[in-house]
Amino acid sequence: MKIIILCPHFAPDTAPTGTVMTGIVEGLVDRGHEIHVVTSLPWYRDHQVEEEWSGRLTRTETTEWGSITRVHPFPSGDKRNLLRRALGFIGFTALVGITAVRPGGWIRKVDAVLAMSPPLTLGLTGWLVAKLRRGRFVFNIQDVVPDAAVRTGAITNRAIIRAAYLLERLSYRCADAVTVLSDDLADNVNAKLESRRSPSTDVAVIPNFVDNNWLAPVDGSPYRDEFGLGDGPVVMYAGNLGYSQSLDLMIALAEQRPEITVVINGDGAMRDVVTEAATRLSNLHHIGYQPAERLPEVLSAADIHVVPLRKGLGAVSVPSKTYSILAVGKPVIAAIDEGSAVARLLADANAGVSIPPDDVGALLDAVDALVGDRKRCEELGAHGPQWVADHASPAAASLAYEKVLAGEQTG
């Protein structure tokens, strides 16, 4: 098949969704498909276009399997400025739509167009490109954006909320297929399509995946040594510092357990809050994003990882970092809604524990239990790599995406 992919990030950009889409592309290429990616210039690490990529609105490179076209993302230096971020998404989306008519031959027919959300704005753009290129349109949902933004209070303007939900419904209805990461997300999308869905619309569940040949436990502690984390117990959160994450739990843990080293890796809208806390708490370390190739080393540095998602978001978001943590053999404490996809995953893998979201006491008890029982902590962590190999391999995900893109029934 000839496939066009529209996504916000792609290697060498360090965003988690970029890692996911890069893996999808590599898997499809291994299966013999011609791929043309339209994405942003790398910008995620410092929220500005990286110096070696700056100076042009677009850049195109030819690959052995197709091409990569990168366009300016118009990033906002302040992730809390939602208006500026929205305008940046609109500008990026417009450039993606304009440039996507060229890869693989000017407006030549393709077999399928795959667009990733967030940003939600790529939905209708993907549909328009698919119409122009006479291909099937598949909408890939990583997070149900309007729901998450509304529930965290990131968006409060009623007009903007109505517009976001309208755009979401239109994007779903225009798609030939929608892919989601869990049954919870599938239920969410199906409910919004109810009574208005096209008979041809398919909602397929394809969990994210990790390359466990690369993302594997790292012996030793080079990351600990580099950042002075010591030899004692280390509890880590690694990922986006956004409104959806209950980072106050990590700060409270550092405040109430001074004997434990607490590490928050990443960047985002809540960076200033985390940085301020780290200046007053000697056992709390804030470390910025590291190069993607260091991920196995970073995740292996912790004894315990925390995946904190605010109450009500468990059904609309599946933190892909969970798979990465399991791959390096570390146990997870998930502060997340009961019965959510991540809670079920940890129970199935026997690789961690789930606690109620936003509950400091529950987190303290869970950390105390694992720190106090090193054998159980190591046993839970040891279950992760095998579960990933059995359930979250790139090969299985690539086959599933191939079927959806080809129009085979998967839902």
Spans of model-derived segments:
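N-terminal subdomain of nucleotide-sugar transferases
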Residues: 1-62, 252-255, 411
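Carbohydrate-associated surface elements
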Residues: 41, 184, 206-209
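Membrane-proximal helix-turn-helix segments that form the acceptor-binding/catalytic region
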Residues: 101, 121-124, 128-132, 158-178
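Conserved donor-binding/catalytic core segment of Leloir-type glycosyltransferases
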Residues: 210, 229-245, 251-255, 263
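Nucleotide-activated donor-binding/catalytic signature segment of Leloir-type glycosyltransferases, i.e.
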Residues: 232, 263, 271-296
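Nucleotide-sugar-dependent
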Residues: 245, 289-300, 305-326, 331-344
